[in-house]
């Protein structure tokens, strides 16, 4: 199938920062659109997001260069050209870029084209996007890990750790799981309000109160779960993403928003061990900094048989980095973010490697999101069993949940909700 036309424009993401939108048309008249997300806390090894750097325009965050790369170099190379499948297009774009991190054309330009082509091919063949991405066996509906309290780089408050999530797993379906999550979210709001704390929300829709400690965030959530009529651990568990790379300073971890305390790698592992023993935690993402490989190995050895340990900044959805982690026995799950690697094909290849080595895949949005629901289809396509797409509010987050409800409805009786078994080692 030939690509007849491809073009891009600059649009805005959920934080009001520019991002890339790509529109693509196939020769049979199929038209598709894709919008590229952007992260706040990014891994050092992520593919390059091309920004203009013109401080007079959007504070240097414009993406006109990336847009121009789609409209000129990429369009010239792929228009009126036949691509048999996704892999053929994506590797053509990788070769066109000529760098190992997509810094010439920009991962935001390349990914926009890659996603738009995937959506167009699915539409053209009258196949749901989740089946185009994962095949006819795509049927597992995920547990939504909802980011109900924000800290770190995602909020201007006193909490060091970036994301405190709830996982409503004791449900018969995704739709009911979302209902449980929303009820806890609203109950938590009432708890915070009663204590005179802020109910303003952060970038991902979670509350961003000023609390006395990171532990207090967990205590508040447990109170919200109970207030909503559910039992912690039995019905709803907790997932964490402290984004520890943001705390890494000269070989130590600095609690830069609360106590200003510096702790060693070993002390950080002990902290997580005590939290896992004390609270109903089923998943810990980026519990250690991306460059603290020794700490990661220690963490995996200590609690890797108790909970799911996810590498985000550590792996950056990169196949070769993941392989290094597998060989070192580090983590037992990988976070999947399309824009960390920059093409649909490379994302799927990383997922395949993870599954072959018994690692879980945890699909994720970015803090700078759009209303594109591609990751909802990806999650079902690869039968990931869990995803994080923000909190119980903000349209760009809810759109992923709405798409998942549509998919569940479409799958009918073949849809199967993952439940607690979505999480590695969960009991």
UniProtKB/Swiss-Prot annotation:
Q: Which reaction does it catalyse?
A: (2R)-2-phosphoglycerate = phosphoenolpyruvate + H2O
Q: Any idea which GO molecular function terms this record carries?
A: magnesium ion binding; phosphopyruvate hydratase activity
Report the cofactor remark.
Binds a second Mg(2+) ion via substrate during catalysis.
Is Metal-binding set as a keyword in this record? yes
Q: In which pathway does it act?
A: Carbohydrate degradation; glycolysis; pyruvate from D-glyceraldehyde 3-phosphate: step 4/5
Obligatory cofactor(s): Mg(2+)
State the superkingdom.
Bacteria
- Keyword Nucleotidyltransferase annotated: no
Sequence positions that bind (2R)-2-phosphoglycerate? 162, 337, 366-367, 388
Residues annotated as binding Mg(2+):
241, 285, 312
- One GO term of the biological process aspect: glycolytic process
Q: Where in the cell is it found?
A: Cytoplasm; Secreted; Cell surface
> What's its job?
Catalyzes the reversible conversion of 2-phosphoglycerate (2-PG) into phosphoenolpyruvate (PEP). It is essential for the degradation of carbohydrates via glycolysis.
Query: This chain belongs to which protein, by name?
Result: Enolase 1
Organism, per UniProt?
Chlorobaculum tepidum (strain ATCC 49652 / DSM 12025 / NBRC 103806 / TLS) (Chlorobium tepidum)
Instruction: Write the gene name.
Output: eno1
